[in-house]
Amino acid sequence: MKVVHTICPGCSVGCGIDLIVKDDKVVGTYPYKRHPINEGKNCSNGKNSYKIIYHEKRLKKPLIKKNGKLVEATWDEALSFIAEKLKNYNADDITFIASGKCTNEDNYALKKLVDSLKAKIGHCICNSPKVNYAEVSTTIDDIENAKNIIIIGDVFSEHALIGRKVIKAKEKGSKVTIFNTEEKEILKLNADEFVKVDSYLGVDLSNVDKNTIIIINAPVNVDEIIKTAKENKAKVLPVAKHCNTVGATLIGIPALNKDEYFELLKNSKFLYIMGENPALVDKDVLKNVEFLVVQDIIMTETAEMADVVLPSTCWAEKDGTFINTDKRIQKINKAVNPPGDAMDDWLIIKSLAEKLGSDLGFNSLEDIQQDIHRNKLL
C-alpha cells in the first residue's frame, strides 16, 4: 500500500488530497494535512473524487462508428481516420474544444495543434465569471482577514472550502453580505445580510473599502467590479468552476461563456472535443456537426454521438499541473496505471499531429512544460 499526494479535481479551489493505493488501485482518500489551502479538510466531493476512475462507463479502447454503432479500433486506425477526415475541411469549419478539467500540459498541446491547423479553439467557463487574470492578485487566504465580505453568487454549494474560509472569517467578526438570484437556505444561513437580485448587474458595491473582499462566482462583468474595487482599495477573488479553468485561460485558450460556447459548436462542421460534454445540456447544439471526435475518460452523452471516441487518462493516472482559482500552479501526481489502452491527452494530440505530418516540438511532458515556461505563459 502507498499514499500519493495530489490535487483534488472537484473544483477550482485546488485542495490537496492523498490517494490510498493498493495493488495499483485507488481504494480511498485521506486528508493531505500539510496542504496550505485546505489544511487536511476535504469536502464530500473531494473524498469521493477517486470513484470516477472506476466508472462503469470508463473508456478503455478507441472506438469508430461503423453502420451506426461504435466499435473497437486500434489507435492507428482511429487516428488515421481522424487525420483523413480533417483534410476535407477548411480551417474555418474546424473547431477544437479544450477543457478546464484537463491539465495545463494537455491544453497547451491541443492549442499547439490548433495553431498549426489555423482552426478555432475555446473552452467553456459555464456560468463562471470571465476574467483577465493578470488583474487579479487576491488569494483564498485573504478571505479570513477581511472585515467585510461580499459574495456575488454562491461559494458554499460547489466550492465548500472557500465557504469554510468565509465561515471562519465570520466567526472572527467579519460581516458577510451575499447577493444571489435564488433564495437558497445555505446562503441565508451563512449571511449577515442576504440580498435577492433579479440580475447580478444590480449588485450594490457602493460601500466597499480597503477592508472588503468581493468573492465572485456568477456570470458578471468582473472588469467593472475590479475597477470599482481598485478605486476603493478593495480586493476581488473570482471563483472559477473547474479544477483548471484558470490554467486553460492563462495558456491562451479563449474562455467562452455558455452562449459563446454553444454558438461556436453550432457553427462547426468538424468538431473535436476534449474532456467536455455539451450534449448533456443540449444535443441540438451539435446538429450541424458533420464529423465529431470526442476524447474523454467515460462514455458521455456527447461521446455516444461521436464518429470517433478516444480514451484518455484521468487525473489520478497522469502527471501534470493545475492552476487553482487564485493562480497557484500545483502538481498532480500519477497514482495508478490507466485502464486498457487509455492514453494521456497530450500524447493523443501529439500522435494525431504526427498523422497529419506535423511536429509539435515536444516528445515528453517535460518538453511541454519547458515550452510553456519558455513562452512565459504561466
UniProtKB/Swiss-Prot annotation:
Q: How is the cofactor bound?
A: Binds 1 [4Fe-4S] cluster. Binds 1 molybdenum-bis(molybdopterin guanine dinucleotide) (Mo-bis-MGD) cofactor per subunit.
4Fe-4S Mo/W bis-MGD-type domain residues: 1-57
Binding annotation for [4Fe-4S] cluster: C8, C11, C15, C43
One annotated GO biological process: respiratory electron transport chain
> What protein am I looking at?
Uncharacterized oxidoreductase MJ0006
Q: Name one GO molecular function term.
A: 4 iron, 4 sulfur cluster binding
* UniProt record similarity statement: Belongs to the prokaryotic molybdopterin-containing oxidoreductase family.
Q: Which GO terms describe its cellular component?
A: membrane
Q: Which cofactor does it need?
A: [4Fe-4S] cluster; Mo-bis(molybdopterin guanine dinucleotide)
Asked if the record carries the keyword Nucleotide-binding, the reply is no
EC number(s) reported in the record: 1.-.-.-
**Does this entry carry the keyword Oxidoreductase?**
yes
Q: What UniProt keywords apply to this chain's record, in alphabetical order?
A: 4Fe-4S, Iron, Iron-sulfur, Metal-binding, Molybdenum, Oxidoreductase
